[in-house]
Amino acid sequence: MVLSVSNKQGFINQSEQFEDRIIASEDTSNYKIVHKNDFAYNPARINVGSIARLTTIEMGIVSPMYICFRVRKGVVSEYLEHFFSTSYFFYEMQKRLEGSVRQCLSFESICNIPIYIPSSEEQHTIGKKISVLLDKIDIETHYHCKLVEQKHYLLRQMFI
């Protein structure tokens, strides 16, 4: 399956991102293979959040323009995934972007961003707590949307 990295949804099927046209080359022999828990990013689009960890399928391929990597032993993928969504990472990334029109972030530059790596156990704990909080935010956001819908419905019923 040919994948793309979306800044909103992470890894997605390329046909979903580019519904109206076929982007993938007929010859995918030079495409990069990504496995579950691997990361990939578009070096020219990372400044808008186009970096993701593959979690939904076991394996796929991405365009050769993507930079793909997996974490070394002792680093928990979920912990690093949350790190990439922090304002600290964004700030450090902005300092390392290269180019004037199309700013890019090389793999060497991303590796030079300082990151605190606690023990694996603590990384798991931090990652799980952040995930629980993000899930709670999603639930509360959905609940809020339903309350707004209900309010609009009730207001319409009052003035029929």
Residue ranges and their predicted role:
Residues M1-I117:
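DNA target-recognition domains and sequence-specific DNA-contacting regions of bacterial/archaeal
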Residues I117-I160:
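Amphipathic alpha-helical coiled-coil/heptad-repeat segments
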